Amino acid sequence: MKRIIFMGRSECGKTSLTQAMRGEKVRYKKTQYINHFDVIIDTPGEYAENCNLARALALYAYESDVVGFLLSATEPYSLYAPNCTSAANREVIGIVTKIDREDANPERAENWLRLAGCKKVFHVSSKTGEGISDILEYLKEEGDVLPWEKEKEEKTTKNNKKTTKTS
């Protein structure tokens, strides 16, 4: 499975998307540092908003196969400069988040991501789950099983063996 790093400003939905993709309950949690979750790298928004911290994002991008630029559908402006993806030596995809919100304008956010240079753009809602499977399918490679699905299967198999032994 391709490894992805999520980048975007604070509160654009990076951690919520990480939780939704992993099948966890989505709950607000402020990301304080760069977190690795199997094939997902979740980053604090301050790293994208501060040019001194942004260097760390550039370095961490080397640990991924794909860079995901996240932009909330409720944003009044874009964090990403036009054609900024040309500086990346990784594939950069756009992810429009919070499409379920009443004040959402996903078309505007998608246009901004395309101006930044994202060729592929996904629309997602971590709250409703809409679009999550599309990103997972995109990241999957032939024969892949999601790491957290594999863990669940192993736990189920282990529990079944315990039940069989006690019977």
PLM region descriptions:
Residues 69-123, 138:
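Conserved C-terminal guanine-recognition region of P-loop GTPase G domains, centered on the G4
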